[in-house]
From Swiss-Prot:
Subcellular localization, as worded in the UniProt entry: Cell membrane
Topology class, membrane: Multi-pass membrane protein
Polar residues composition-biased segments: 344-363
Name of protein: Chemerin-like receptor 1
Modified sites of kind Phosphothreonine: T342
Cross-referenced Pfam families: 7tm_1
Organ and tissue specificity: Prominently expressed in developing osseous and cartilaginous tissue. Also found in adult parathyroid glands. Expressed in cardiovascular system, brain, kidney, gastrointestinal tissues and myeloid tissues. Expressed in a broad array of tissues associated with hematopoietic and immune function including, spleen, thymus, appendix, lymph node, bone marrow and fetal liver. Among leukocyte populations abundant expression in monocyte-derived macrophage and immature dendritic cells (DCs). High expression in blood monocytes and low levels in polymorphonuclear cells and T-cells.
Gene designation per UniProt: CMKLR1
Record-level Gene Ontology MF annotations: adipokinetic hormone binding; adipokinetic hormone receptor activity; chemokine receptor activity; complement receptor activity; G protein-coupled receptor activity; signaling receptor activity
Highest taxon of source: Eukaryota
Protein's organism: Homo sapiens
Length: 373
């Protein structure tokens, strides 16, 4: 938290309080009162829009996938992705309230830990699911026969279980370090990496930054960057580049549409998360840059990052087969997209789910490669 030096003994030291902007911990002391107010209003508006669209879009996907669709491997991916994003959006109102109340936390220490844990857990779960979707599609293109024989719903559920457990462990620092404290008449929800009590003799001052707390801060930040962004982006990019090369070499791509979808998926994911992780890495060496860069940049980067939770239904469903045909009802479009098996992209969107399911099962290997996204 950026405080004036004379106030620092009664506040959270910068090296100890990790301003986790993903859950609305936005510190605006480097901004003018007007700028700070405008920024808070902006965040409340953006978070509210994301919350509404995310709950509506992901909720609709969950309902259709659970009650209307035949269980396929793709269905398992889409369902888990929607559940992860839905949980993220459900807890956004807490952080919308936090921002609206000028960052005064009224929900208690336990909820401070749990809410942040769920948000970070969603980040890892969503990223890992997007990665496994890309890997699954790549394998289906490179090894169609193996994929046909070994790709099963049971295996997909097992993979999702591993993803959720792995995300749990990577998010567990929030349950340990998350804390609340009364600072300047407000209750703050923050990361207390020194695990000391604010205001106590063990609480580090501005000139006496806790090296252990800073080390923990660095480990958490770098781990989130590597596991939650860099490695998944490299895998996703490699998968789709491999798919593009395979389709071009075999001359299976009849249109440019699959390539547009591939580019859109990669660029959108990169744009949503790159600013957030980059600024958090730079913040480890915050003295090298003006505080206003983080006060303005991190809220904007955070808004962009959380927007990914409501973009996924658009990118992975509405950009599917023939979704630009306005005459088709929304429900039919969702059913059509969610019933697609990996590699199918040539069915008219007005066909019924029953007919599509039977056709999916009879589709040849060549069609699977041709339509692979």
């Amino acid at each position: 938290m950026r405080m004036e030096d004379e106030d620092y003994n009664t506040s959270i030291s910068y090296g100890d309080e990790y301003p986790d902007y993903l859950d609305s911990i936005v510190v605006l002391e480097d901004l003018s009162p007007l700028e700070a107010r405008v920024t808070r209003i902006f965040l409340v508006v953006v978070y509210s829009i994301v919350c509404f669209l995310g709950i509506l879009g992901n909720g609709l996907v969950i309902i259709i996938a659970t009650f209307k669709m035949k269980k396929t491997v793709n269905m398992v991916w889409f369902l888990n992705l929607a559940v992860a994003d839905f949980l993220f959006n459900v807890f956004l109102p807490i952080h919308i309230t936090y921002a609206a109340m000028d960052y005064h936390w009224v929900f208690g220490t336990a909820m401070c830990k749990i809410s942040n844990f769920l948000l970070i857990h969603n980040m890892f779960t969503s990223v890992f699911l997007l990665t496994i979707i890309s890997s699954d599609r790549c394998i289906s293109v490179l090894l169609p026969v193996w994929s046909q024989n070994h790709r099963s719903v049971r295996l997909a559920y097992m993979a999702c279980m591993v993803i959720w457990v792995l995300a749990f462990f990577l998010s567990s620092p929030s349950l340990v370090f998350r804390d609340t404290a009364n600072l300047h008449g407000k209750i703050s929800c923050f990361n207390n990496f020194s695990l000391s009590t604010p205001g106590s003799s063990s609480w580090p001052t501005h000139s006496q930054m806790d090296p252990v707390g800073y080390s923990r801060h660095m480990v958490v930040t770098v781990t989130r960057f590597l596991c939650g962004f860099l490695v998944p982006v490299l895998i996703i990019t490699a998968c789709y580049l491999t798919i593009v090369c395979k389709l071009q070499r075999n001359r299976l791509a009849k249109t440019k549409k699959p390539f547009k979808i591939i580019v859109t998926i990669i660029i959108t994911f990169f744009l949503c998360w790159c600013p957030y992780h980059t600024l958090n890495l730079l913040e480890l060496h915050h003295t090298a840059m003006p505080g206003s860069v983080f006060s303005l940049g991190l809220p904007l980067a955070t808004a962009l990052a959380i927007a990914n939770s409501c973009m996924n239904p658009i990118l992975y469903v509405f950009m599917g087969q023939d979704f630009k045909k306005f005459k088709v009802a929304l429900f039919s479009r969702l059913v059509n997209a969610l019933s697609e098996d990996t590699g199918h992209s040539s069915y008219p969107s007005h066909r019924s789910f029953t007919k599509m399911s039977s056709m999916n099962e009879r589709t040849s290997m060549n069609e699977r490669e041709t339509g692979m996204l």
